[in-house]
């Protein structure tokens, strides 16, 4: 009788824990833009997972869209770390063709445009209106998202995902909740004057950091009740730092989205600010990337106690361990939610 009572008690406790987890608040992870600095998101994600925090939504801009998009389809932080370290970034950030893989037909098309993918009978393409067309980075994104090349609903990914781009035809914000994942990520990281824009359905799409570099507002719209944000944006520069064309242009870009940025920082439950001092959006050498990933982890570890305490607000116990979808596996056709067209939101 004693053992039966003990068994019933254990079952009741397990049921209560399960019910509590089911009734918990939804958590959104927001990853800011920042070029090379965005690899710091990988280190921060490692800590968030170590803390056992459940992740219900991922939203990113620019490099945050790249890291977030891959994470949302099941790439683990460890896999992402390996991917970053395995790349020849000088090659990726150029349009130099790989002679071992470039077909003659591709070489003939090389001077026209980079990317052509079917979307509801039309195509998205990248023109030459930038220093870099982005041929090689787009090829990498395509390879990393095998199984997600159809037009799909990002809400049906292992973790629902969205990313932000800016339509420079009218200055509107474009939020990708559907479409071809590689195209959405590429559009979000089209830094004006560096990477060519993505032309899609009458829109000319550039880096979302121009309009919403830290998109907490989008995560809230998706249903996130708790926000954990990772921020690699540099603070505004002082007068004596604005001494070059690049610094002036960077300051102008940051000022455009400053009001939205401050509001979104204030709306974060935990705002993980990564120390990116000494590094820029172009710091793609291996030593810098390793340092930035380490700094991302260090920044998140500084907020460790806050992360653990946040579990109570989420509605889970401090010992709760979330399950994550990785490691990445190529999905079967039945896992994809094919839709007839790309839906975009322009608030």
Regions found by a protein language model. Name each.
Residues 1-25:
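Bacterial Sec-dependent N-terminal signal peptides
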Residues 19-61, 69-347:
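Patatin-like phospholipase
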């Amino acid at each position: 009788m004693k053992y039966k009572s003990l068994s019933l008690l254990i079952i009741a406790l397990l049921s209560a824990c399960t019910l509590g987890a089911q009734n918990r608040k939804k958590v959104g992870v927001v990853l800011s833009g920042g070029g090379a600095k965005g690899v710091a998101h990988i280190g921060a994600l490692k800590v968030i997972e170590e803390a056992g925090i459940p992740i219900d939504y991922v939203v990113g801009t620019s490099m945050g869209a790249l890291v977030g998009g891959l994470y949302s389809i099941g790439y683990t932080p460890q896999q992402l770390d390996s991917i970053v370290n395995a790349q020849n970034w000088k090659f990726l950030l150029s349009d130099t063709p790989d002679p071992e893989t470039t077909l003659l037909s591709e070489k003939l098309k090389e001077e026209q445009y980079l990317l052509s993918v079917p979307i509801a009978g039309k195509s998205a393409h990248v023109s030459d209106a930038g220093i870099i067309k982005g041929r090689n980075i787009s090829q990498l994104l395509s390879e990393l998202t095998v199984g997600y090349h159809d037009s799909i609903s990002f809400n049906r990914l292992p973790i629902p995902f969205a990313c932000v781009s800016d339509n420079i035809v009218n200055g509107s914000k474009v939020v990708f909740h559907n479409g071809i994942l590689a195209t959405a990520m590429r559009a979000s990281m089209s830094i004006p004057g560096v990477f060519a824009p993505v032309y899609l359905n009458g829109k000319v799409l550039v880096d979302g950091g121009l309009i919403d570099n830290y998109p907490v507002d989008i995560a809230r719209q998706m249903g996130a009740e708790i926000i954990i944000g990772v921020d690699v944006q540099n603070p505004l520069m002082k007068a004596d730092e604005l001494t070059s064309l690049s610094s002036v242009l960077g300051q102008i870009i940051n000022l455009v989205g400053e009001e939205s940025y401050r509001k979104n920082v204030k709306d974060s439950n935990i705002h993980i600010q990564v120390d990116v001092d000494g590094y820029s959006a172009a710091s793609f050498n291996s030593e810098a990337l390793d340092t930035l990933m380490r700094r991302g982890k260090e920044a998140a570890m500084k907020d460790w106690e806050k992360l653990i305490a946040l579990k109570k607000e989420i509605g889970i116990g401090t010992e709760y361990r979330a399950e994550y979808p990785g490691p990445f596996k190529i999905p079967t056709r039945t896992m994809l939610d094919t839709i007839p067209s790309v839906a975009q939101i322009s608030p």
